[in-house]
Amino acid sequence: MEKFFITDNTTDNTTDNTTDNTTDNTTDKLTDNNSIDNDKINKNITVDSLTNDLNKLSLKSPSDKSSSGKSSIPNKSLVPNKSLVPSKIFFSKTTFFKIKLDEIMSCHNITISDLNSIKNKIESKNLQIDEINTIIIGKILKKLGLYKYHGHEQYILNIIIGKPVQKMSSQEKNLIMKLFDQVLVTFNLLKKKYNWNNFLHYGYLIYQLCKLLEYNDFLDNIALPNNETIIYVNNQAWKKICSHNNWIYYEISQIKN
C-alpha cells in the first residue's frame, strides 16, 4: 500500500474555532450565517479603492470584456451606494466573511498528533491515496472526535495526499474583501425583488470570488456545501448578482469530493 507522509506545512498549534455553516437539510432558502462578534469589526474596508487596487495587481481592467460581453472583474460604475445597506448588517457580514476567509485561506494549525491519528485511521482501512476523498476524511474526523477540524476536510485531504497548500497574500485577501463589499450591496439591492431571505453560503461565495478573480490555485482548499439543493439555490442567486454587475457567471454543477 502506498505510504503517507506528513508535509512540513503543519504546526503544533490547534485551531479551536474552525466551524462549518453548511447544513445537510434540504432547503429552498439561502443559508444564514449571521453570528458575529462586533468587537472584531473592521470599519476601514471600502469599495471606492477597488479600481486602483486592481490596477496595482495588474488584473484586467473593468473595461476588459469576454466574448460574451461580461467583465471578468467588477465595473466600478455598477457598484451601488453601500449606504443602501444598514451599517450594522454591512459591517457584521463583512467581518464574518473575513473570519471565514482567514479560516479557509490560512494554513490551519493542525497538530502532528491529530494528523497522525487521521493517517493511522486511513491506513487501518487499507485505503489507497486515490480512494480518499473529503467524505471519508469527514467520517474519520467524526470517529476520532476531532470536531474542531469540521469544515476543513479538503485542507486535511490535501495534506494527506501531499498536495501543496497554497497561501493567499494580503493583497489577494484585500481584493476579495472589496469584491465581497460589492456583492453585499448588490444582494441587498436585489433581495426584495427575488424574495431572498438569507445571505449566500460563505464557502460558496469565497469559491466564486476566487473563480471570478482567476485565483484557481486556492479552489481546492475551499469546502463547498455538501448539499445539491443549497448549491443550486446559491447558483441561482449568484447568477443574478453576476448579471446585475455584468460579471462572468461560473456555475458550480456538482459537489466536490
From Swiss-Prot:
The keyword Transferase does not apply. Residues 26-35 have a biased composition (Basic and acidic residues). It comes from the Viruses. The keyword Transmembrane helix does not apply. Residues 1-35, 58-77 are annotated as: Disordered. GO terms for biological process: regulation of viral transcription. Residues 7-25 have a biased composition (Low complexity). It holds the Pfam family Pox_VLTF3. Keywords: Transcription, Transcription regulation. Belongs to the nucleo-cytoplasmic large DNA viruses (NCLDVs) VLTF-3 family. Putative transcription factor. This is Putative transcription factor R430. It comes from Acanthamoeba polyphaga mimivirus (APMV).
